[in-house]
């Protein structure tokens, strides 16, 4: 990649994160490697964390337009799609800019043969109406709309069926969430232990 490329840095970090974990360490290393500063550094970081925060939703939408699924794609192409869709849906980046830059990234990562697929999938995915989605059950709905793992979605559905989606979406928006333990189902301490085990809270 020649010159500052915050989108490319975000995609490269996402590829490594999916393979190795430790998101903050990987992102910091990629930002240093590409010598990104100021707005470029902030933009790359925003893309990276927006993808991680909304990955369940992003993957569901993209999968509607990928008959063979996301898992069959090259890692770089998969992350290019996620990053572009995240920009258009959650970061107020114009759809045309998100798509055009994603197509450019296929060349940057030597995946030019995927440029047509990236262009076609994104143009449809960006306009996808989640409100029209039909889910198998409430757990799948929570997983997609709340971008939650299955264990988290099951736990919240069982213990907080009326509040589960609000809990997930408010947490994603950075708001504060208060929970009250149901004394008929357990103690506050037991609830805290379960939430810690599911990485829903941190102490």
What does each model-found stretch correspond to?
Residues 1-200:
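Class I Rossmann-like S-adenosyl-L-methionine
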């Amino acid at each position: 990649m020649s010159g500052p490329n915050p989108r490319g840095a975000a995609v490269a970090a996402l590829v490594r994160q999916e393979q190795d974990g430790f998101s903050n360490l990987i992102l910091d290393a990629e930002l240093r490697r590409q010598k990104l500063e100021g707005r470029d550094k902030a933009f790359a970081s925003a893309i990276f964390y927006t993808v991680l925060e909304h990955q369940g939703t992003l993957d569901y939408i993209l999968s509607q337009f990928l008959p063979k699924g996301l898992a069959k794609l090259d890692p770089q192409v998969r992350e290019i799609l996620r990053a572009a869709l995240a920009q258009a849906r959650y970061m107020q980046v114009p759809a045309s800019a998100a798509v055009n830059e994603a197509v450019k990234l296929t060349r940057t990562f030597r995946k030019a043969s995927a440029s047509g697929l990236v262009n076609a999938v994104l143009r449809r995915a960006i306009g996808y109406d989640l409100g029209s989605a039909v889910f198998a059950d409430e757990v799948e709905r929570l997983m997609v709309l709340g971008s939650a793992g299955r264990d988290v979605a099951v736990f919240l559905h069982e213990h907080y069926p009326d509040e589960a989606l609000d809990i997930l979406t408010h947490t994603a928006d950075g708001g504060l969430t208060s929970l009250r333990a149901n004394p008929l189902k357990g103690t506050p301490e037991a609830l805290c232990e379960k939430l810690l085990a599911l990485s829903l809270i941190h102490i």
